[in-house]
Amino acid sequence: MKVQDMDKCAPSSDWNVLYWVLGTVLMPVALPLAIINIWQRFQAQKFRNQLPGKVVLITGASSGLGESLAHVFYRAGCRVILAARRTQELERVKKDLLALDVDPAYPPTVLPLDLAELNSIPEFVTRVLAVYNQVDILINNGGISVRADVASTAVDVDLKVMVVNYFGSVALTKALLPSMVKRGSGHICFISSVQGKFAIPQRAAYSASKHAMQAFADSLRAEVANKNINVSCVSPGYIRTQLSLNALTGSGSSYGKVDETTAKGMSPDKLAERILQCILRKEPDIIVSDVQAKIAYYLRHLCPSLYFWIMAKRAVKLENAEKKST
């Protein structure tokens, strides 16, 4: 063989060595993950066939992701309970669901709920259990957001966000948990946010409430694992909903604007389908976001100094933009 021919063969040989090394290193990890993924898909299909007739309670069901979740679970044949403050909007969602061609179809139940009124939640759960005597799947989706920096946010606003986003879901979960434990089955799904994984400027109150939700879900999951109760925590990125439009300012007034990031966010319908799969597969914790948010998540944990530097730059940029707009 000529020298030139040997040179031509060298890269191929090098690549073969590289592939062998990567295969040797990654195969022990990749193979079990692939098997787990196949098993989860099999289980998801199995449990999807068991969904018809399941009782699903969805908070924040009057619009946005909650409304999309109502459609997804209703089409799956579930007995859906719609909960939120705005009864008129819940009735609209119910009417839309009844117009769908679904078999089997159970008429949705509308029950008004204000997560900020913690003392009313035990009575709300009594009404829920009076309808179907059980809840198979609880989806803690209701919540509000804030658009303001720490210095300009009133403590009352911090408190309101924490009560609605965290304590409301905690109170509802605690009120329903005994019935799930007694039956020996149930699934509790917390709709958190990527901001429950890492914090960004001008979202302190919102991010704090989602961090608290994440911690609560993780603790609860461990405590009920031996009781046949599953706990999932879903952390989405930006979603095309009215979350920013309905957000609060630091003083507690209405923000009243749709952020560019929200407008370009993922479809709530697609996210609702992914959440259904999460519950069917009994996935404990998932992040559903674009690549940028996932990079931020890994930076926060693997290279925190760089993450903090990026966030500091972002804070200055947001502050300057706010000054120009006023």
Curated annotation (Swiss-Prot):
Presence of the UniProt keyword Repeat in the record: no
Signal sequence interval, chain numbering: none
Source organism superkingdom: Eukaryota
Membrane-side (Cytoplasmic) residue stretches: 1-17
Designated name of the protein: Dehydrogenase/reductase SDR family protein 7-like
Peroxisomal side: 39-326
Primary residence: membrane
Its biological purpose: Putative oxidoreductase.
